[in-house]
Amino acid sequence: MKKESVGVVETKHYNLSEELILDGGDSLKDVTIAYETYGTLNKQKSNAILVCHALSGNAHVAGWHEGDRKPGWWDNIIGPGKCLDTDRYFIICSNVLGGCQGSTGPSSLNPETGKQYALEFPIITIKDMVKAQKKLIDHLQIKQLFSVVGGSMGGMQVLQWCVSYPDMVRSAIPIATTSYSSPQQIAFNEVGRRAIISDPHWNEGNYYEGEFPDSGLALARMIGHITYLSNESMYEKFGRRLQDKEEYSFDFSTDFEVESYLHYQGDTFTKRFDANSYLYISKAIDYFDLTENGTVSLSEALKNVKARVLVISVDSDWLYTPAESKEIVMAMTANEVDVSYCQIKSSYGHDAFLLEAGQLSYIINGFFSETLVVDVMTIHAATITEDSSIEEAAELMLDEKVTHLPVVSEDYRMLGIVTAWDISKAVALKYDKLDQIMTRDVVTALPQDPIELAARKMRKHNISSLPVVNDQGNVLGLITTDHISTLIAGDKY
């Protein structure tokens, strides 16, 4: 399959209609969420993948904006025929709350003052970012995400989604991340913040009408960027080579290529990022701790996770180490979560999750190819009780636009199924009760059945729908031939 770009794209904006209550007790009014989408949401709204970005990222994850010289930050894995295939999936990425690329943050106008929030913006957490994303997903009328994917701080958001909204996440892929920020990670973030705060132009955060604290922000970026690389990658990229000179300068000017590279990274960063946003987002990273500062175990924190999870680490990542990823896997395994683990082999360090598109695509494609019934089924499917009338069943089918209704007991135990064909037969024969027409010997699927098994059952019995039940026979949802054809054929409609 030919791999292509999604082409020219535009950033959209969603304005929350209600206040957003924050983790720390404050609230925000008139919150705006900037987001981009790629691909088409199918009619079941079951093919949506939410991509979560890292500290310095934004909603522009793929394609090109008019006049851009570079594509979106994960364009190498998102697009037609790529790993996150936009011919098959509907990809969503939003700028995080507290950001500076279209979503409400400290550089946004405070509706109560008409001026930038600056330090009047409340402290936020990863949980707040995810809460804002959930508002967006609700706005898009998506009841359950096919997957949530993200690296670094994006991986923290993935884990928070699994914890905060377990019923909304079918699969999750946290990459190069951690379940809580370590003292070393907090230390690096604090040095970066001090670099910004120490800049005389920072002015207690009130710099928007004057000169910006670019020197401090550039230094913060330089410090952070070092943690994204590995010693091996720096040797490969720079060694001890001098920058545009044959010998040492014997002064404090730039001598080495690696110095010049860091200066470039810092300077370019100031042209696209807000210093106050850096303060707020890095603090949110520091506060991230699923164990709630050690008051619960990680296993306890992850006990309600329902998603199928793929944890990915990078062998040369010393910012968020493989050991931290394995700790997540162990905690999920203790809760019998369907979790798998893969490690990217790379010399790039933490940034490998952005650069190793080949390995990442191979791993993720393998994970998605093992699609289960739970990954695509309709949850909260319409059901009806045995004592209902034929007329009630017909009205429910029309209202819900379905052709199959599982018949259940008061505790949602599967009793049978009635179809549109059964209703037609009932009208012809003048039946008035469901128990006169419903099928009691029903072919069903389990949520953990491979999708191929469900498809074989439908072909064998010449049926177009299977109720999905748990081990106790309770109805959990419904899977149809439309779900399967959309998944296999990449049918967007």
Swiss-Prot record:
Q: Which GO terms describe its biological process?
A: homoserine metabolic process; methionine biosynthetic process
Its subcellular locations are: Cytoplasm
GO CC terms of this entry: cytoplasm
According to its UniProt entry, this protein's organism is Methanobacterium formicicum (strain DSM 3637 / PP1)
Q: Does the keyword Transferase apply?
A: yes
Transferase recorded as keyword: yes
The residues that hold substrate are: R221, D351
Where does the chain cross the membrane? none
Identify the metabolic or biological route this protein is part of.
Answer: Amino-acid biosynthesis; L-methionine biosynthesis via de novo pathway; O-acetyl-L-homoserine from L-homoserine: step 1/1
Q: Where is the CBS domain?
A: 377-434, 438-493
- PANTHER family on file: HOMOSERINE O-ACETYLTRANSFERASE
Q: Which GO terms describe its molecular function?
A: homoserine O-acetyltransferase activity
Any one Pfam family here would be CBS
Q: What keywords tag this UniProt record?
A: Acyltransferase, Amino-acid biosynthesis, CBS domain, Cytoplasm, Methionine biosynthesis, Repeat, Transferase
Q: Which parts of the sequence belong to the AB hydrolase-1 domain?
A: 47-356
The family note in this entry says: Belongs to the AB hydrolase superfamily. MetX family.
Name the reaction it catalyses: L-homoserine + acetyl-CoA = O-acetyl-L-homoserine + CoA
Q: What is its main location?
A: cytoplasm
- InterPro entries membership: AB_hydrolase_1 (IPR000073), AB_hydrolase_fold (IPR029058), CBS_dom (IPR000644), CBS_dom_sf (IPR046342), HAT_MetX-like (IPR008220)
Question: EC annotation?
Answer: 2.3.1.31
Q: What the protein does?
A: Transfers an acetyl group from acetyl-CoA to L-homoserine, forming acetyl-L-homoserine.
Name of the featured protein: Homoserine O-acetyltransferase
Q: Which domain of life is it from?
A: Archaea
Residues forming the catalytic site: S152 (nucleophile), D317, H350
This protein's assembly is summarised as: Homodimer.
